[in-house]
Amino acid sequence: MNDSGNSSKVNVRPPSAGLGAPSPGKRKMLRLEVRNSQVPIERKPSWIRARATIGTEYRKVQERVKKQNLRTVCQEAGCPNIYECWEDREATFLIGGSQCTRRCDFCQIDTGKPAELDLDEPKRVGQSVAQMKLRYATVTGVARDDLPDGGVWLYAETIREIHKQCPGSGVEILIPDFNGKPELLQQIFEAQPEVYAHNIETVPRIFRRIRPAFRYDRSLDVISQGQKAGMITKSNLILGMGETGEEVTQALRDLKSAGCDIVTITQYLRPSPRHLPVARWVKPQEFIEYKEQAKEIGFSGVLAGPLVRSSYRAGKLWAQSVKAKMVEIPERVRKLINEIEMQETSFRQAV
């Protein structure tokens, strides 16, 4: 983040129930959720605190969002990294609705029957990126197993709309697994996002308990298909859900073997009492060690830290990965790469 100009510093404490915990609504709690809720929300350690600088670019983006009545995940989730990402003119958007057809025990998005697909949403997201004058947008969404194509058209069309309305901006797409079907993933590849991301989130031993609708091997294959299609690939690991250090190291090796270029490593923050209790708080020194391991394993981009999220400073991490991999840079984003490289290189929330 650029500290020049009119800026002020604030301490940001993540919300007590995680990043923007949802209301359970009228849905009856599952037995698992009842069991989870018997464990009180854990007190966060002193190092789970974001130190933010409110700079000039952040204020400009904030004014545009307010004036145009735009919506971003950054705001609605109360993300403590918003100050730094917006200062870099980066933001994250959620598509496909507010209800997911799958339930992961760490995830704040509610599970239920989704509304009909909003076919105008891709165009509105593209307009938002243009109005906010973003240079890099991350797009993620809910699983839509209620649809024959899993909602893949919506993801691909959103990439196309952002490229159309903001030809100089980068797009990172964070997808569900679309059941690993090559014909569906091909639609994402053809839309040509700058980064193709799918998060494995945790290790094999506890994967099924935490992500019952996903499969570890299938998630790795989703990443492999992206790598074979020539994508820059990315994934995320959440720590503090019951994994061991050896399992984390092996998961990093699995990701690299699958063709993953970029990895982010973060601390689990419990969204609400009905979610999985925190197994442990990973100390900053451990994140440093995991970061070094990931670099040694061969990832071209690594960010690790308690408040790192998969979309945190995504444009900066992409630019670093492109440079490290020495891949050919498309003409459309060469100017963007140069802009990013000229900026400050530090990541405030990473170790």
From Swiss-Prot:
One annotated GO molecular function: metal ion binding
Cofactor: [4Fe-4S] cluster
Region (Disordered): 1-27
Note on cofactor: Binds 2 [4Fe-4S] clusters per subunit. One cluster is coordinated with 3 cysteines and an exchangeable S-adenosyl-L-methionine.
Localisation per UniProt entry: Cytoplasm
Enzyme Commission designation: 2.8.1.8
Domain (Radical SAM core): residue spans on this chain: 86-300
InterPro entries the UniProt entry points to: Aldolase_TIM, Elp3/MiaA/NifB-like_rSAM, LIAS_N, Lipoyl_synth, rSAM
Annotated protein name in UniProt: Lipoyl synthase
Residues holding [4Fe-4S] cluster 1: 74, 79, 85, 311
Cellular component, GO, one term: cytoplasm
Bias (Low complexity): 14-24
SUPFAM superfamilies noted in UniProt: Radical SAM enzymes (SSF102114)
The entry's keywords: 4Fe-4S, Cytoplasm, Iron, Iron-sulfur, Metal-binding, S-adenosyl-L-methionine, Transferase
Annotated positions binding [4Fe-4S] cluster 2: 100, 104, 107
Taxonomic lineage from the root: Bacteria, Bacillati, Actinomycetota, Actinomycetes, Micrococcales
Main subcellular localisation: cytoplasm
